[in-house]
Swiss-Prot record:
CDD domains linked: Glyco_tranf_GTA_type
Top-level EC class as recorded in UniProt: transferase
Name under which the protein is recorded: 4,4'-diaponeurosporenoate glycosyltransferase
BP-aspect Gene Ontology terms: carotenoid biosynthetic process
PANTHER family per record: GLYCOSYLTRANSFERASE, GLYCOSYLTRANSFERASE 2-LIKE DOMAIN-CONTAINING PROTEIN
Annotated compartments: Cell membrane
Family: Belongs to the glycosyltransferase 2 family. CrtQ subfamily.
GO MF term set: glycosyltransferase activity
E.C. number: 2.4.1.-
Membrane topology: Multi-pass membrane protein
Transmembrane in keyword set: yes
Length: 375
């Protein structure tokens, strides 16, 4: 069995080498104090049945050091979303129904929201987002000024978990970030064409010139289409990590919601990663199974060194934790038991593949969307 031990050691070592390459380029927000004696920007929040989440976001907006307008686009909510939003002083606008079925997801709400914005700068922020610091919005504006106040800036929030099951989102969140290509030196350095969806910042002129969310009207995950629309107009598209300024808590409704959410995400947004980066990601993930396989076999066969296999597993686990700490706060127990996370990720990936290629339909928040029609 020594030969198998050597093979597994080589596989895990190669896997960790890939892990060192998939997220070795950082894109972090730079803070700077700015002075505004007028509204700095308009924050547009698309919301559908968000009464349990939107209050945290609105409270964090009130704490910001720069003055902003807040518009909550109420997209057919049947709960108290509108009442909660108004209690924080936000302007609530009911989304006009899409009777023609030409729009998917939140793009319809976002596009309508821009018509109510009073400032040139506009930011689209999901209802489950929270600004962690009082200078968070100020930092976003500063970063946007550094790119000449042109194009599109987007942020992937730091993922905060509170219940054990929420940690099963770990790999998905990491893949969302590294799958954008620009966080790896394996990227060829060409113009970025993709954007994160939870937090985006732009200006009205560029928004309307590119078509804005109209370019993503048939997309459930709008970031890729939005980024491509800006790139096609030779406008810059930038992506940043959220920590320590922006965070979100996902799928707090329960484990079923988590499964449905990530199935939707993979069904519609897994095609933008470049082949060599995707290959490195797959090889890195395979190291999780290879390391636990070596550990289990060493406990059964004396020819394999238990000490060596334990060291191999711990080495991979250390890197696994290190990479995930950049994107979120997850259960230490789940991090150590990463093969469980890998198996869950595989299950959802297969499930999303079936929905995309066999059924052509994905369901989210009580609405069904045809994947086969998404362009």
């Amino acid at each position: 069995m020594k030969w198998l031990s050597r093979i597994l050691t080589v596989i895990v070592t190669m896997s960790m080498a890939c892990g060192a390459l998939i997220f070795n380029r950082r894109h972090q927000l730079k803070t700077k104090t700015l002075n505004f004696n007028h509204k700095a920007l308009t924050i547009i929040i698309p919301a559908r049945n968000e009464e349990k989440r939107i209050g945290h976001l609105l409270h964090s907006i009130i704490q910001q050091q720069v003055p902003v307008d807040v518009i909550v686009m109420n997209d057919g909510s049947t709960d108290e979303t509108a009442r909660v939003a108004r209690s924080y002083g936000a302007t609530v606008v009911d989304v006009v129904d899409d009777t023609d079925g030409k729009w998917y997801g939140k793009s319809h709400a976002c596009y309508q929201g821009v018509t109510h914005a009073c400032t040139n700068r506009i930011a689209f922020v999901d209802a489950d987002v929270t600004f962690l610091r009082k200078d968070a919005v100020e930092t976003l504006i500063n970063q946007y000024q550094l790119q000449g106040e042109k194009g599109l800036l987007s942020v992937q929030p730091y993922h905060i978990t509170k219940r054990f099951y929420e940690g099963f989102s770990a790999i998905f969140n990491l893949m969302t970030v590294v799958g954008m290509n620009v966080f790896s030196t394996l990227d060829d350095g060409r113009t970025n064409q993709h954007a994160f969806g939870p937090v985006t910042l732009t200006n009205k002129e560029d928004y309307y010139a590119t078509g804005g969310h109209k370019s993503a009207n048939r997309h459930i995950i709008e970031g890729f289409a939005l980024g491509s629309a800006y790139t096609s107009q030779s406008l810059p598209v930038t992506v940043y990590e959220g920590f320590p300024f922006v965070a979100f808590r996902m799928y707090q409704e329960g484990f079923q919601s988590l499964q449905e959410g990530w199935t939707k995400h993979l069904s519609t947004g897994a095609g933008g990663t470049k082949p060599k980066i995707m290959t490195a990601i797959v090889l890195w993930l395979f190291g999780s199974i290879a390391s636990i396989l070596g550990l289990c076999l060493s406990l059964k066969y004396r020819q394999m060194s238990v000490r060596k296999m334990v060291a191999l597993y711990l080495s991979y686990t250390t890197q696994f934790i290190y990479l995930h700490r950049r994107v979120g706060q997850f259960s230490n127990l789940l991090m150590v038991c990463h093969p469980l996370l890998f198996m869950f990720f595989t299950k959802i990936f297969i499930q999303s593949w079936k929905q995309t290629h066999r059924y052509g339909v994905v369901e989210w928040k009580g609405r069904q969307y045809s994947i086969s029609k998404e362009q």
